[in-house]
């Protein structure tokens, strides 16, 4: 997942889609099938790899989800890489935002429902993990 988050061609991490206000708020979740443990984060703005933070939530906290400033604070406390929010922005995503705003149509198209970037894996012993 970190490879996808670091690649500006994907809409997770660097290259994330902007909010209507022109900011990037990132989400990530992870689940481990054997233990059924899960961790997730929402509205992260400073954590370079939100999937790493979701894993920390799963492994190092009593919570299943953290959001916003509290999630970024937890990330910094756990020593995860922090970046300026501008790190996530790309010219292509900014162009897409401006194109959508110029159309002056509904921001949410009910016919175009897409999820986030995801990955699943099965180990040699049949253990399944998803992120």
Model-identified regions with their sequence ranges:
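Alpha/propeptide regions of enzymes that mature by internal proteolysis
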Residues: 1-131
């Amino acid at each position: 997942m970190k490879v996808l988050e670091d690649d500006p061609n994907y809409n997770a991490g660097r290259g994330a889609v902007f909010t209507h206000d022109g900011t990037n708020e990132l989400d990530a979740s992870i689940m481990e099938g054997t233990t059924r443990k899960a961790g997730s984060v929402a509205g992260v703005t400073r954590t370079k790899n939100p999937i790493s933070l979701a894993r920390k939530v799963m492994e190092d906290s009593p919570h299943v989800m953290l959001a916003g400033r509290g999630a970024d604070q937890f990330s910094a406390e756990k020593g995860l890489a922090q970046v300026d929010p501008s790190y996530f922005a790309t010219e292509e995503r900014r162009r897409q935002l401006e194109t959508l705003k110029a159309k002056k149509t509904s921001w949410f198209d009910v016919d175009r429902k897409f999820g986030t970037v995801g990955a699943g894996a099965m180990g040699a012993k049949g253990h399944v993990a998803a992120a």
